[in-house]
């Protein structure tokens, strides 16, 4: 059935290309949007219908598992105070951005996602849930350097994809990272954004970028001392011990203590069995 569905879609797509050459472009765009409506999915969360754009099986899976893949992240977001500022660094398609915006009143969210594969879906999810007043998408990478054009390596060019690397030659485990999918893009440091008053200091920060969490923290050494920051959730690979030590040293220096360490063992097996979400609380 899936082969039949794909074949039909390809035939329709070819028909659209031919029609586009001989017809009005606006008609084609409207028809294309009509076809894509089948990719919109609603899920009952927080006793509300929340909408998601799910153009493939991976994004559909991410939406299906939003509440049970990382329950510690959901619990952490539930603890946020109203009228707070949340930085979602490594937002992917925006699951936790959308959840936080729906859960908390008057929250302001800066959603960081440099992957061109994910930005299309992230922006749609914000738009279809009418969260433009609460959510601000930052479409570039963060690192320890200011204003650099560096290579972003994508594990796969697909919506909902992860395990990417910005400006480094290693992956989430510290091993050499070889991929064919890459392009140069802009990145800067957190301190640069704060010092230039481009963004506001957050109360809560989530960092899940699959490999350069330590570099992002190095680029935030001034901001991390700010008492406005209440807690930081960082995805850490315990098996990437050099990186883990750097992260703990930075957090301790800025008066953070480990509040919790959790993961759902069902989803983190084999290559991912060293990965945990650490929540650091300001002392």
Question: Where on the chain are the PLM-derived regions?
Answer:
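S-adenosyl-L-methionine
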Residues: 1-130, 134, 175-179, 258-283
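Conserved acidic-Pro-Pro-aromatic motif
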Residues: 40, 83, 104-111, 118, ...
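Glycine-rich adenosyl-binding loop in Rossmann-like folds that engage adenosine-containing cofactors
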Residues: 46-75, 132-133, 138, 143-192, ...
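Amphipathic coiled-coil/heptad-repeat helices and related helical stalk/stem segments
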Residues: 69-73, 93, 186, 216, ...
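Active-site glycine-centered loops adjacent to acidic/histidine catalytic or metal-binding residues
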Residues: 90, 141, 208
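Hydrophobic packing residues within well-ordered alpha-helices of enzyme cores
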Residues: 100, 122, 135, 150-152, ...
